[in-house]
């Protein structure tokens, strides 16, 4: 049984979050949680919360056994960017893009 959890509009770029997602793809959830706990990146904390949510969803909604679960799929898509202005010298301005991403984790017992 596949169970999904999503974090939409996560305040990190998809490029940075994909680095973390690649670490746990296909792993058992216990191993994935351990990897994320000791990964020193902001995106690791965001991905860990989504993974914990997916585990809780599987346990509560589907009655799955946590020991059998693995990360079947994990992907990070780009969300909308917030446009901001940074003043520069001589009256000019640069546009800053504050990027967001959509993190999706699918856990499965097979």
UniProtKB/Swiss-Prot annotation:
This is Large ribosomal subunit protein uL22. The lineage of its organism: Bacteria, Pseudomonadati, Pseudomonadota, Gammaproteobacteria, Pasteurellales. It comes from the Bacteria. The keyword Ribonucleoprotein applies. Part of the 50S ribosomal subunit. This protein binds specifically to 23S rRNA; its binding is stimulated by other ribosomal proteins, e.g. L4, L17, and L20. It is important during the early stages of 50S assembly. It makes multiple contacts with different domains of the 23S rRNA in the assembled 50S subunit and ribosome. One of its GO terms (cellular component) is cytosolic large ribosomal subunit. Belongs to the universal ribosomal protein uL22 family. GO terms for biological process: translation. HAMAP family: Ribosomal_uL22_B. The keyword NAD does not apply. GO terms for molecular function: rRNA binding; structural constituent of ribosome. InterPro entries: Ribosomal_uL22, Ribosomal_uL22_bac/chlpt-type, Ribosomal_uL22_bac/org-type, Ribosomal_uL22_CS, Ribosomal_uL22_sf. Keywords: Ribonucleoprotein, Ribosomal protein, RNA-binding, rRNA-binding.
